[in-house]
């Protein structure tokens, strides 16, 4: 059978949790097989900051994300076409997913305006006026040649209310039809529509229903993890997975905190992406089950342990916390070493969840993970509620009060995550 007869995406559920909505799957793409649930590191401009493709292969990364907005500006469509696509351009043999570019323009550019035609914005490089239409977004993504590509959607701030939310949802549906019409490589690239609707349950349901009428191979859930409360966040995820078809992959955009990943897998999500692992590495922070280690802190000066004794990444095999503390305060190379570890951590977390689902031990995995992650404080109420909604019960812990400012530690942790979310959104 020739390559043109191989479906560009097939998805099979290989195991399901008997309690929650978690499932393990196998997604077969043009360039590689991808085991789900999966975390996709973000290579904004065709590379992860501080990590080369060979290192990603060593970490057994099966799929990464490329940013259409940045790649469309630099190196540009002509360069990508001449190179034969992003895979050849960056020397990456495995799968790539590309976003549409809409989120970056609306969230990062002050002068972006949206109308029915598309997104009008000024280039950050030369201040020239630019227009990104659904058709142009698809043209760029066809040139990039990713295995999975996203429709251009009408993005509004998550906390927006009123008629603008419905307008954006309806426009997103109209735009997916324009994207499908413009898609010139359906035989080897799979286009995902994006579920929008803000924090409005009926709008989310309407959007899912409309998008399911289109002939697509998977679905993305957008417009979340952008400042809404965690209670609203998990409820919208739960609503979407409750209506999306079970035989196609579900991608939750822009989510990367470890606890969020575990909860959303329980709610039925298969795919995730976020810049968080590499961005937090540039601040000298390493990811572990209990949260983050800020290796710039003096307490690590004489700590001769690896970041995580259970991690087999090259950073943990070779370097101590003491050494990483030393270079974190002096050398930029530390961000590369920490990025390797942080990506390895995210990939290992996803692998552990897959294996637990396949053994039908996912609820116990969740309980054990949350006990480690919130070792010194109560599990936040939103996590208990979200897991309870899919029949995973966690014990309610007593609130512990920080004597310094009398704030519950859960509230202080949430403030820290808010800062991290702002950093992620600005990257």
From Swiss-Prot:
The keyword Glycosyltransferase applies. One of its GO terms (biological process) is tRNA-guanine transglycosylation. Residues 397-417 have a biased composition (Basic and acidic residues). It catalyses: guanosine(34) in tRNA + queuine = queuosine(34) in tRNA + guanine. It comes from Drosophila melanogaster (Fruit fly). This is Queuine tRNA-ribosyltransferase catalytic subunit. The gene is Tgt. Its cofactor is Zn(2+). Belongs to the queuine tRNA-ribosyltransferase family. Residues 254-260, 278-282 are annotated as: RNA binding. Its main location: cytoplasm.
């Amino acid at each position: 059978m020739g390559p043109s007869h191989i479906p560009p995406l097939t998805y099979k559920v290989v195991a399901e949790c008997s309690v929650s909505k978690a499932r393990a799957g196998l997604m077969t793409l043009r360039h590689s097989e991808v085991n789900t649930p999966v975390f996709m590191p973000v290579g904004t401009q065709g590379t992860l900051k501080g990590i080369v493709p060979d290192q990603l292969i060593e970490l057994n990364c099966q799929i990464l994300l490329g940013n259409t907005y940045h790649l469309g500006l630099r190196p540009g469509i002509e360069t990508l076409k001449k190179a034969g696509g992003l895979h050849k351009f960056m020397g990456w043999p495995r799968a790539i997913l590309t976003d549409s570019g809409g989120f970056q323009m609306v969230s990062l550019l002050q002068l972006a305006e949206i109308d029915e035609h598309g997104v009008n914005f000024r280039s950050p490089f030369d201040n020239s006026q630019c227009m990104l239409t659904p058709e142009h977004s698809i043209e760029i993504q066809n040139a990039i040649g990713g295995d999975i590509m996203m429709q251009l959607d009408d993005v509004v701030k998550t906390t927006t209310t009123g008629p603008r939310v419905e307008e954006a949802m309806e426009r997103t549906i109209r735009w997916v039809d324009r994207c499908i019409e413009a898609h010139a490589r359906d035989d080897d690239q799979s286009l995902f529509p994006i579920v929008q609707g803000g924090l409005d349950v009926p709008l989310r349901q309407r959007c899912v229903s409309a998008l399911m009428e289109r002939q697509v191979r998977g679905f993305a859930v957008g417009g979340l993890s952008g400042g809404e409360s965690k209670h609203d966040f998990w409820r919208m995820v739960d609503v979407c997975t409750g209506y999306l078809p079970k035989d196609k992959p579900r991608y939750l955009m822009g989510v990367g905190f470890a606890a969020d990943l575990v909860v959303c897998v329980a709610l039925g999500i298969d795919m995730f992406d976020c810049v968080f692992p590499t961005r937090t590495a540039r601040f000298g922070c390493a990811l572990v089950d209990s949260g983050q280690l800020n290796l710039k802190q003096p307490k690590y000066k004489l700590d001769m342990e690896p970041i995580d004794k259970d991690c087999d990444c090259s950073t943990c095999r070779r370097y101590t916390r003491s050494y990483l503390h030393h270079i974190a305060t002096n050398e930029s190379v530390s961000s590369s070493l920490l990025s390797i570890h942080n990506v390895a951590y995210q990939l290992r977390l996803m692998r552990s969840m897959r294996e637990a689902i396949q053994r039908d031990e996912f609820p116990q995995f969740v309980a054990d993970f949350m006990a480690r992650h919130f070792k010194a404080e109560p599990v936040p109420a939103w996590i208990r509620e979200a897991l309870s909604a899919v029949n995973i019960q966690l014990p309610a812990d007593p609130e512990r009060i920080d004597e310094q400012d009398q704030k519950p530690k859960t509230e202080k942790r949430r403030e820290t995550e808010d800062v991290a979310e702002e950093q992620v959104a600005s990257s």
